[in-house]
Amino acid sequence: MRYKRMYIIILAYILALFLAGLVFDDPADILPGLQKIAETQDVLITDYVAIAGPGAAFVNSALVTLISTAVLFLARCPLNGFTITEIGLMSGFALFGKNVVNIWPIFLGTWLYARIQKEPFSKYSSTALLATALAPLVSYMGFGSLYAHPLGGIITGVFIGMVLPPLSAYTYKVQNGMNLYNMGFACGLLAMMLVPILTAVGDAPSSVLYWAEGYNRPFGAAMALMCLVFIVGGLFFSGRPAWAAWAGY
């Protein structure tokens, strides 16, 4: 199947993210930057480029993308348009809220839910990835809350990972498939319950603004190159003549 070769393309994309991190920043700053990213409270708006530099941000994106791909592969979840979209979401938001630390408790919670239900994790692997929309809450409970403790972040993430599979199944019935962002809807409902609870105990998250500027040209050039590679790859490496690939589009 044509989607099987996508693993090679995804790995090449991950490598490109690593290389971008090395190009855009001093390699010596990447590991300290990753530590900053892992320990930030992730309250909106937290731009990883602003707090840790572009190198650490891109390497974090590469690592999160690699972990997400590995989760799908080990769960034997077939690659298709939906799962590739999930990988893209993980990659993009790893510049802005998701990191190599705060996604794991949510994965664990979803895995535990699958074990309790006595069902394969592959059935919920996509839910596990999309549930990391609330990964910033894990970081907040671990590093930013008045009651911050790493164990609190882990417990919060496990709770999120266990609650969202049944909640997303319910919200799908509510909107009857009319909302393409069903997991976003479910995550929003859960956040609407959790944040008021924090506010009630005097722990309301305060908004911040870490927003990087001055990268328009280099990032714009990198984005243009990436889009060009995708277009050329789709036209000439899809196993069909270029005109047929274009006609299919």
Name each model feature, range by range.
Residues 1-3, 133-160, 164-221:
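Membrane-interface helix-loop-helix junctions at boundaries between adjacent transmembrane segments
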Residues 60-68, 72, 84-118, 127-131, ...:
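Alpha-helical transmembrane segments in multi-pass membrane proteins
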Residues 72-81, 117-124, 141-146, 166-169, ...:
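Alpha-helical membrane-embedding segments
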Residues 193, 201-206, 230-248:
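Juxtamembrane interface elements at the cytosolic ends of transmembrane helices
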Residues 19-23, 70-74, 115-116, 138-141, ...:
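Structural signature of transmembrane alpha-helix termini at the membrane-water interface
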Residues 9-14, 184-185, 213-232:
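Alpha-helical transmembrane segments
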Residues 49-53, 76, 92-101, 120-121, ...:
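Membrane-helix interface and helix-disruption motif detector
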Residues 1-98, 230-243:
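N-terminal signal-anchor module of multipass membrane proteins
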